[in-house]
Amino acid sequence: MWEGYADPKFTKEFEESHHCKVTASYMGSSDELVAKLRGGSASNYDVISPSSDVATMISKAGLATPLDLTKIPTYTQLSPQLRALPLVKIGGKTFGVPFMWGPDPLLYDTSAFPNAPDSWDILWDPKYKGKVSVWDDLSTVYMAAQLLGYDRPDPGQLYNLSDEQLENVKKKLLELKPNIRKIWATGGELTNLFENHEVVLAMGWPLMTNDLRKHGFSIGETIPKENTTGWIDHLMITAASEHKELASEFLEYMIQPKTQKAVTDVTGYVPANPAAAQFMTADERKNLHLDDVDLYYQRLYFWQDVPRRDKYNQIWNEVKAAQ
């Protein structure tokens, strides 16, 4: 699971009503999840929360089981736009339910930036040498590709770059390395970097914004003028699960409006079930863009299946290894 998706604030009720224990193993990237599923430990997991860049591959690879949607009646309440996407639909079968979605925003320390930076290019400013953090994930590759203009005219091109384009992305990221204090792998790691004043800029998640504000840290979050990538997390049942009936009941519980609101309270992410909005204040709806969701969609380039994922990872690993 991604961090925040098995918080006791909302899993405890399911545990009590179903006389079970929800035990989470958190992941730091989509590739980490795929490695766990393929590495012989798939039977350790009943439910997974893959993002939209690997959900299709997991479905096609037989790592998830087709869902019986009659056992998940709340599925029909989920956003029609999200349900219409082909990400988890293979051969007429549905392998996952949309759960949460959101952006990969630019996070900044407001004591260093009274006004929100308006471009991802700020990460490369020599003024912030050693004060930047980026995610150990292909999202960093996508972000550099955006700055190089590879999202125009088709943002989907970010997920199918040519060898030449990937080499240019690599050069761009190598230019960033002097500014990078640390490449973060978990949400808690980035939260600590900000709280310890080790960094003032980072690509992050709304979860970190939520956590830092709860801790009293003055963090800002923005989507720069280049826009940003975004993700749709799905809940799936692993093919190796020995508790498929219980897992189906868990999926049903997790997409119900009240649970979705509780997950949003923990993570700051946008719920896949619009009915969760009835439990929110006007400010909460505004902060999640639920009143202008169609416009918000246009600012996010949702992750897609990456046909040449191994090549992307090779480029990213070369960037990380460079001195």
Which ranges hold each PLM region?
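Periplasmic-binding protein-like
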Residues: 167, 172-176, 213-239
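Early extracytoplasmic/lumenal segment of secretory-pathway proteins
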Residues: 1-57, 191
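A bilobed periplasmic-binding-protein/Venus flytrap-type ligand-binding module shared by bacterial periplasmic
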Residues: 105-112, 147-148, 232-243, 262
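Paired acidic/hydrophobic, glycine-rich loop segments that form the ligand-binding mouth/hinge
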Residues: 45-49, 183, 200-205, 220-221
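Mature extracytoplasmic/periplasmic domains
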Residues: 229, 238-297
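Extracytoplasmic ligand-binding site segments that recognize negatively charged/polar headgroups
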Residues: 3-7, 44, 49-55, 59-195
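Conserved C-terminal helix/tail region of periplasmic/extracytoplasmic solute-binding proteins
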Residues: 293-323
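A ligand-binding cleft/hinge motif common to bilobed small-molecule-binding domains
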Residues: 55-57, 201-218
